[in-house]
Amino acid sequence: MSYGDDYNNNDRGYGGGRGFGGGRGGRGGSRGGRGGFGGDRGFGGDRGGYGGGGYQDNDFGNLPKQDWDLEKLPQFEKNFYKEDPAVTERTDEEVTAFRKENQMTLHGDGIPKPVTNFDEAGFPPYVLKEVKQQGFEKPTAIQCQGWPMALTGRDVIGIASTGSGKTLSYCLPAIVHINAQPMLSHGDGPIVLVLAPTRELAVQIQQECSKFGKSSKIRNTCVYGGVPRGQQIRDLARGVEIVIATPGRLLDMLESGKTNLRRVTYLVLDEADRMLDMGFEPQIRKIVDQIRPDRQTLMWSATWPKEVQRLAHDYLKDQIQVNIGSLELSASHNITQVVEVCTEYEKRDRLVKHLETVMENKESKCLIFTGTKRVADDITKFLRQDGWPALAIHGDKQQQERDWVLNEFRQGKSPIMVATDVASRGIDVKGINFVINYDYPSNSEDYVHRIGRTGRAGTKGTAYTYFTEDNRKQARDLLVILREAKQHIDPKLEEMGGGRGGRGGWGGRGGRGGRGGRGGYRRGGYGGGGYGGGRGSDITGSNSAPLSNSRW
C-alpha cells in the first residue's frame, strides 16, 4: 500500500447522491430544478453532437477539435458572489490601504473589494464549516482578493509566490460552482478541471479538494502518468465532478475516449509558468480546445513571463488580475539566504558541515537540491553511508517509491530528502526548516522556487547555496535577489557578479577540518538499515543503500 493510496478516494462517492439539505435541485428557485439541459440529458441526443457543428480534423492524434456553437450550448450559472454588508461599508480609502498593506496590485475593470475574513467571503455554511474545522485562522492575501474575484464568475489571473494559499483560492469557489450545476449523468466528464505540472502537485490539490468537498459529496480523481491507468479509468467511468490532472496523461485519456470535457465549465491552470517551462503548452492548448469557450477560466502562476501572458491572452476573456507582491523576481523575506562560493570538490565537506548544524534539532527537515538525477543518487548514497537518514526523489524513481519517500520525509522518519527540480515546486511539506542547493539551478527563477520550500506561511527558514565558477553567469541575477531581501553577500560572489578579473581561484580543496562529534542523534527505531517497516523490493538504487549508525 503506497502512501498515495491514503487519499486516492478509491470508493469515490462519500455515499449515494449529492444532496446536502435536500439535494442540488432548485437552489433557491434560480435554476428551476434539473431542467435546463433539455430532455433527459440535454446534450442533443447522442452526446456526440454537444456543441453542434461537428468536428474538424487536426494534428492532435485521435483527439477531435470541437467546433462550438454557443447558441446550442446549455446555459450554466457561474456568478455566485453576494458582497457582505461589512465589505460594502468599507470606504475606498480603507480598501486601498488594505491592498497596499498586503502588496496587492489589480488589473481590470469591475474588480470586487477584498474580504478580510472567512465569513465575509460569502461561502455557503457547508463550505465555511469545513474551513473552520481545518483550523484556518484567517485567509491569506491571495484568498482575500481571489475569492470574490472567482465567485463573480469572471476569468481570473492570480500571480503569487508558492506557499501563498493559491489552491484554496480556486478550490472553494469550485465547490460552490459544482453545487450550482445539474448533477452528472452516466457518461459525463467532470465539471471542474484542474491542470497541474507535476503528479506531486496534482495529488496535493486532490487532498485539498477531498477535505472541502466531503459535506457536499463531491467526487474527485487524480489523473497523472507514471502509474497504471486502471484505477484512474475506473474513477472516470464512475463519474467525478473534479478531475485534477497533468496534461500528458489527461490527453492520453481523452484520445482513448476514457473521458470527455463537454461538461467542464470551471477550468483551472495551476502553476501555469511551470507547465510552460516543462514544455506542456501544446498539450494545454489541445486540452483547452476541448472545453466550451464560455467556461470560467482561472490561471494561477508564481511569475508572469511573456509566454504565460500569451496563453492568458488566447484563452481568457475580460479577465481580472491580482498580483501579490512585486512582479520582479524576489524571494520570501522569511528566508535567510546563505550563498557560499566554493569549488565543486568542496561541496561535500560543506554539506556535512551544514547538516551537522541543521540536524542538531531532531525535528528539523532538510531538502537538498541537485542538478541531475545521478548527483541526487550519489549524494544520497554518500549521506547514508556517512550515517545520515537521506532518501532521494527524482524522475527515474517509480511513482510508488516517490510516494513512499515523500511520506517518510513528511512524517520526519527520513528528515533529509535529496531531490531534483521535480520537487522544486508544488510539493507542500510542512515544517521544512532548511533548503540546501547542492547544485545551483540553471536560472534564478528556479532558485527562488527551490528555496521557497522553506519559510512558508509566515514561518522562518534558511537556505544554503553552493555557488561555483561554473555558475558565474547567474551571479548578477542572484545578487539582485539577495540585495532585494537584504541578505549578507559573500565578497567572492560580489566579484563574480561584477565581472572583474579572470577565473582566479579562491584556494584549492583545502583540508576537511574537524567534523565534530559523530554520535548522538538517534531517532527512535530508525537506525540500522531499516526503513520503518521495510519496503522490500519497492525501494531501489540510492534509497536502498545501507544506513550507517554513526549519525542518527
UniProtKB/Swiss-Prot annotation:
Binding site for ATP: A160, S161, T162, G163, S164, G165, K166, T167
Domain Helicase C-terminal per the UniProt entry, residue ranges: 350-497
Positions of the UniProt region annotated as RNA-binding RGG-box: 506-535
Listed Pfam families: DEAD (PF00270), Helicase_C (PF00271)
EC number: 3.6.4.13
Ranges of biased composition (kind: Low complexity): 1-12
Compositionally biased spans, kind Polar residues: 539-552
Gene Ontology cellular component terms for the protein in this record: cytoplasm; nucleus; ribonucleoprotein complex
Entry keyword set: ATP-binding, Cytoplasm, Helicase, Hydrolase, Nonsense-mediated mRNA decay, Nucleotide-binding, Nucleus, Ribosome biogenesis, RNA-binding, rRNA processing
Catalytic class of the enzyme: hydrolase
Record-annotated Helicase ATP-binding domain positions: 147-322
GO BP, one annotated term: nuclear-transcribed mRNA catabolic process, nonsense-mediated decay
Catalytic activity: ATP + H2O = ADP + phosphate + H(+)
Sequence motif DEAD box, location on chain: 270-273
Extent of motif Q motif: 116-144
Biological role stated in the UniProt entry: ATP-dependent RNA helicase involved nonsense-mediated mRNA decay and ribosome biogenesis through rRNA processing.
Full protein name: ATP-dependent RNA helicase DBP2
Taxonomic source organism: Yarrowia lipolytica (strain CLIB 122 / E 150) (Yeast)
